[in-house]
Design a protein with these regions (language model features):
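Selective recognition of specific alpha-helical transmembrane segments in multi-pass small-molecule
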Residues: 53, 57, 151-163, 226-252, ...
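TM-loop-TM module centered on a large, flexible mid-protein loop between adjacent transmembrane helices
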Residues: 69-75, 240-290, 297, 341-343
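C-terminal membrane-solvent junction of multi-pass transporters and transport-like membrane proteins
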Residues: 351-416, 423, 427-428
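Hydrophobic, membrane-embedded alpha-helices of multi-pass small-molecule transporters
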Residues: 11-21, 162-169, 177-244, 280-289, ...
Length: 428
């Protein structure tokens, strides 16, 4: 087969959506809706740019470059290896994978209890099941695309349908002070926190494996199908974010002052369906977290198997699942203190790599733009994210530094310098 059918392409898109859509993606839109109130839709536009547009652009950029290693290698081959390892570890066993179990258990706890033994037993079953599903990374479509993602979407539609039929308020409420003006920018900043753009750089390889497992062998067709799957996943993210955000805006109007998106969803589910609503919400969280966990275990295991082919993929997948289980129960808080600053340092670099990749022939015409732009950005983002004393204070004092965008000016300087300078020719 040289081309995917529409149905199979849709399944691949469902698979990618389910890998993206974790607990944070559930929590952020209703929280945004509750806080933005009558300014929800302008804020949603900003959220769509940073939480949907950037991740989809990341999938497209990696597919066009034929892999993250080639994309990051435009800076330097050594940079590519270090960057990839840091990303895989940060969004994998050092942060995102352990949090899938701890977050989903937190939503189950009101129903089953909060004992340490219960959490340990849950996490063992959770990661064992995720490991078994991830054992065949090229067949994730069978589980995520065909079964688990449709189940998740049906449950979300039930919750949203209840909100449509029995809204908690007749109209949106008053916005919080930060959304009174500049709601679009606030939405961009809020969507920026999902950090799905980093995940997008990693998911492309697994999606390509699943496309090839459908019988597609031509590299051009794999690339095209990956890009189309990215747009399918982006469309689903946009629709689900809109539903959750609208529900959050009405819930926030009915019950002002809710602290988090999880609180918003809990109030919504409880008022619509009572205890059955809390069971529904817990099922949504467990499914969303499980899907993301499977995708991340597959991505991290496949990458390290590629680095060390002598170690089989199941060994890496099992190791990362077991390590994540231990971290989620024993040392998650300590790991978060280390991994979150690393993620904050990596994120601007990832955004710039994606943006630069869409400039035609940039690498050929101005080969220094990539290393200088990424180098300047990395210096600022590392100094801003890590406690480096006066250097950190200087990095945060740059324009837009107060809102986490202090890297914009160094990136612009790097781009300008890269366009003006020429590499020194090597002596024969």
């Amino acid at each position: 087969m040289q081309k995917l059918s529409g149905r199979k392409l849709l399944l691949i898109g469902f698979t990618l959506f389910s890998m993206f859509f974790g607990a944070g993606n559930l929590i952020f839109p209703p929280d945004l809706g509750a806080k933005a109130g009558i300014h929800f839709w302008p804020a949603f536009l900003g959220l769509a740019i940073s939480a949907v547009g950037l991740p989809v652009a990341g999938v497209v950029a990696v597919a066009r470059a034929q892999g993250l290693e080639k994309l990051a290698g435009r800076v330097h081959p050594v940079f590519a290896q270090v960057f990839m390892i840091l990303i895989y570890l940060s969004i994998g066993p050092c942060l995102a994978i352990p949090r899938t179990a701890s977050t989903s258990f937190a939503m189950l706890a009101p129903l089953v209890g909060t004992g340490a033994g219960l959490q340990l037993g849950y996490s063992v079953m959770f990661f064992a099941a995720a490991f078994l599903v991830a054992l065949q990374p090229e067949k994730l479509t069978r589980w995520l695309g065909r079964l688990l993602c449709p189940c998740l979407l049906v449950l979300i539609l039930v919750l949203f349908g209840g909100c449509l039929l029995h809204p908690l308020a007749g109209q949106y409420g008053a916005p919080t002070p930060e959304y009174t003006s500049g709601a679009v920018l606030q939405g961009v900043l809020y969507g920026y926190q999902t950090m799905d753009t980093l995940a997008a750089l990693n998911f492309g390889a697994i999606i390509a494996l699943n496309i090839q497992a459908q019988g597609v062998t031509r590299q051009e067709e794999v690339q095209c199908s990956t890009i189309l799957a990215g747009f399918v996943a982006g469309g689903l993210l946009l629709a689900v974010y809109a539903m959750l955000g609208h529900a959050g805006a009405l819930t926030g109007a009915a019950v002002p002052g809710l602290a988090t998106g999880a609180d918003v969803l809990t109030v919504l589910a409880d008022r619509l369906f009572g205890k059955a609503g809390l069971v529904l919400l817990a099922a949504i969280f467990v499914l969303a977290c499980f899907n993301t966990c499977v995708g991340l275990i597959a991505c991290v295991g496949e990458h390290f198997h590629t680095l060390v082919p002598s170690v089989p993929y199941p060994a890496f997948a099992g190791f990362f699942a077991a390590a994540s289980m231990l971290i989620s129960n024993l040392g998650l808080a300590d790991i978060l203190r280390l991994s979150v600053p690393v993620l904050n340092a990596l994120y601007p670099v990832a955004i710039l790599l994606i943006c630069l990749s869409f400039v035609p022939e940039l690498e050929q015409r101005h080969p220094l733009v990539y290393p200088l732009c990424i180098g300047c950005t990395a210096l600022q983002s590392v100094a801003s994210a890590l406690p480096l004393g006066p250097l950190s204070a200087l990095a945060k004092a740059l324009p837009f530094g107060a809102v986490g965008f202090g890297w914009v000016l160094p990136a612009a300087v790097g781009i300008l310098a890269g366009m003006l300078l020429r590499p020194t020719p090597h002596e024969p």
